Amino acid sequence: MERITVYTAQRIYTMDPGRPVASAIAISEGRIVSVGSLESMQPWLRRLPHDIDDRFKDDILMPGFIDPHTHLRMSGTYMGLHYVGPITSHAPSGPQAPLASRDAVLVRLKELVEATNDPERPIITWGYDPGMQGGHLDRDMLDAISDTVPIWVLAYAPHIVYTNTPMLERTGVTEDTTAHGIGRYPDGRLNGWFIETSAVGTATRPVIKDVYRPGFGQEALLHQAKVAVQNGVTTVADMGWGFESFEREWDDHMAVVNQPDFPLRILMTPFEARLNGKYGDDALDYLKSMASQGTDKLSVHGVKFINDGSYPSMTLRLNFPGYLDGEVGLTGETPWAEMVARMLP
């Protein structure tokens, strides 16, 4: 064992019911040797060289929090877009003000359309929350803002994209399209909704170079890591690896997470529908090969199956009485019986 460093504090909260509170913690080689008091760890300190570090003597320490469901790279990337959400967004460029209602969002979208000097370039926004801002957007609402400039709005929980007619036309979706997650009005017309991962992918393809800008993935990770640490989080699981690209996402994480000063451990959990779609019967072999490349700070863990939507986006599948607008949500793109079969060993 290398030299021990002992950090003292006013109080240290532990996760050990036998010793829930301590006043010192001994570390060596990046691992905990002992938690207790300077007196209780004397058996170690008498035998091994050590230093006492009292920089935290007036502070209260606690274990780092674990966030089991994040999308740091994805979320950080979206923060580079125009924001139309209901709470303040702490983007890399600075705090972005919230919009309280759907009407306020429509006003903001109109401002963005009027400010553009390129009517061929889509207005790309993110953060809309139908539950908090007064209900869903739709094609007719967005067409009333502009029926010439393409408008693309991603929900805060990114399970829905809302589009106007010019943007809808760029996706290639027509009235004859029968793909899962393509929204329609009660009369059968396309309503500009793209619901859940497959449909969101369809809506994103025409703007993918604007959403996932080159080099922004690593910058997004660095920014989101700062946000996490400011809130006491030290370990996260990315529950959507592969949504954009397995290779690009992994490379960005490897380049950033393993830097000595990067403050998080990240567990990468692949999105099963993308994994199966790309690798098929070789999916498990691919995961094993990627797991072998993992490090202490970046590892592969589990597989994510999505069977329905998102509660904030009001696409989560509900039984009676459903949502206030009468909808009951949507199943995922993979039929449930098929999903169960793919879960089995």
Where do the protein language model's features map onto the residues?
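Glycine-/acidic-rich phosphate or pyrophosphate-binding loops and their flanking alpha/beta elements
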Residues: 288
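Divalent metal-binding segments
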Residues: 2-9, 13, 17-284, 299-344
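Accessory "access/gating" subregions that flank catalytic or transport cores
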Residues: 291-294
